[in-house]
Each structure stands twice: as structure tokens, then as C-alpha cells.
Amino acid sequence: MSTANHFQRILEKLSISDNERAVYTKEAEEIQNYVVDELKRVDKTFRQVFDGLSLGGSYLDRVKLNLPDEFDLHMKLKFPFDIRPTRIDQGFIYLEADLTVINPQRIHRIVLQDWLRNAFRKVFRSNQTIATTSNRVYKLTYTLEGYGCAHTILAVCGSRSISFDLVPAFEFSGSQWPFDICPVPADVSNNWPWFAIPQQKKKSAKPRTTFMVCAPHWEREIMKGKDNLKNVLRLMKGLRDAHARKLPHLSSYMLKTVLLHRLESADWERDLGTLLVEMWSHLVDHLRARRLEFFLAKDHNVFNRMNQNEIKICLENASTLLRKLCIAQTCGGSYHHVAQLFNIPN
């Protein structure tokens, strides 16, 4: 069996059946709808401004491995006044609102998160459980309380758990993109929205009012029709997951960003082994340079989310994995050898 077939087999091992995925997804939808309904019940303002949930992360890109037990959701908010994004730099923006008293006035990120935190706490003041239509009873807890970006809900039923990262977001059209360069073609930006999410900008003169751009739908659209791109991303995520302790804070979005920068330059029709070695090699190069440009704003370094020691550890261990991948690819290693790299039992 060729090395390319080994990697294809690994990919199949990392995946789950559509039926199993559907069960988790249905239960997740019931849980998230319950939480939203409870937020509407306890907070009048939330009831008025909530504008729907928008899926993000690996599940939106359809590259989620194993069970769909982690959901990234943008919690869209639409207030009864105009909000305009104004650029700062490095992917950061202010949100200017037309208010009656002061015009314009910036949306205050801390005040926004405090309000949402209070609403969540009202819901979870008492023990929360939900019985799904599949007759499972989940206990719900409110964990990360929006002090970073997300409000996290953990749902547990026996050995089964599902987590939800709910990130407050303001939705904008492509015509409202605040920076000089739009990173995607017009047919994408004109048909899909982007979001502003609460994010602190380090060393900012106005750190309490900064937001950051994100555009998961743009990224999803430009990744379409790229043959093996998504499969390579799945393999990179599987390799990262197998060595997560040795690759601290190396996020799925960082792996995805490595590929986004090579959408047009790489030949995605090549076999999985060749592409995996090439893309993992690019990851190592970025770690060595200690820089990975944000796809939406080149002046922002995505690795800023890691400290220097974490980058050093990631570089050492990613380099070791690259050497092992190269040996497997060039020497025609056995399936057993390749499976070991992914911690997959034979």
C-alpha cells in the first residue's frame, strides 16, 4: 500500500459517520436554542437585539474531526441604531454608534460583555438541565464568562459532553469593510457578511473599545473547490490533536491560516502525503520566524496569542514531527508507522 493510501486511511479513521454526526448536531441545536430562549426570557434588551446565531470554526468549514462536540457560534446583536466600523490597524476596529446624547459614540466592549455576563448569570443562577428529543438529559454550566471573547456553555450527559463558545458579534456587509485591501474576491465579499467581535488590542490608547474583524464565511467560500485542501487541514488538525500537549496553544485557526496563505500557489490536486509534508513544513517556517500573518489583515501576527516559550516548544516539536513525516513519505513507511504519528491504534 502506498503512503498516499496510508494517509487516506488515517483520514477515514479520524472521521465519524454522518448518522453519528447528525445525532450530536441535533442535540446541540436543541441545547443552544434552549439557552437563547432562556436569555430572552431573563433579559428584555437581549430579547430585542438578538439577531440569530451564526456557525463558525471547524464545523462551518466542515473539517471537524471525530465527534462534533465543540461549537463556535457568533451571537449576532442588532441594536436599534446605526453602527459603523472605523479602522485602527492590525485587524482591529472601533464601532461608532449614532446615539441621541452623544454622536458618534463608540461601543464599549467591556460594558457589552458585562451586560451579557449578567444575562447569562441570571439564567444559570439555578441549576439548568435540558431533556433532548433523543431522551438524554444534559446538565448545563456557564464556564468561561466572556472575560476573553466567548461565553462558554458546557452540556454534560454521562460521558457525553458538548461545549458551545458563544461570541457576541456585529454583522456587516462587504461594502462596509473598513480596511484599504479586501482579502477576498468581490463575488465573495458582496454575498457574505463579516463580523466585528470583542477583542482587546494590546498597547491600545483606547483598549476598552476595540473590536476585531473576522470573516468565517469569506474563508469558507474561498476554500471551496480546492481538491485536497480540506483533507490536508483535517490531517494537520489530527496530527496536532495527537500531540496537543507538545504543541501548546497551536490553534486550528493557525493551521487554517497557513493554508489560506497558499490557496492559489499550492497544487491541491497532489496526493495527501506530499501536501501534508509541504504544509507542515510551512507551519514550521512560520514558527521559526515567529510570525504568521492574519489572513484578513497582514499587519497582525496570529502568533501573538502565544508567548515566546510556547512558540519555542511548538517549533521544536513541530520540527520533530516534520522529520518523521518526511521519513514516512520518502521511505515509504508502513501504515503502522504512519498511524503511530497520529496515535491511532492498529
Curated annotation (Swiss-Prot):
Activity regulation field: Activated in response of some unknown stimulus. Not activated in response to L-monocytogenes infection.
Positions in coiled-coil regions: none
Disruption phenotype: Flies display a normal antiviral immune response.
Pfam families: Mab-21 (PF03281), Mab-21_C (PF20266)
UniProt xrefs under InterPro entries: Mab-21-like_nuc_Trfase, Mab-21_HhH/H2TH-like, MAB21L/cGLR
One biological process term in Gene Ontology: copper ion homeostasis
Domain of life: Eukaryota
Residues that span the membrane, as ranges: none
Ligand binding (ATP): 58, 70-72, 216-219, 237, 252-256
GO molecular function: ATP binding; GTP binding; metal ion binding; nucleotidyltransferase activity
The keyword GTP-binding is annotated on this UniProt entry: yes
Keyword Transferase: yes
Keywords noted in UniProt: ATP-binding, GTP-binding, Magnesium, Manganese, Metal-binding, Nucleotide-binding, Nucleotidyltransferase, Transferase
Binding-site positions, GTP: 165, 212-219
Protein name: Cyclic GMP-AMP synthase-like protein
Organism of provenance: Drosophila melanogaster
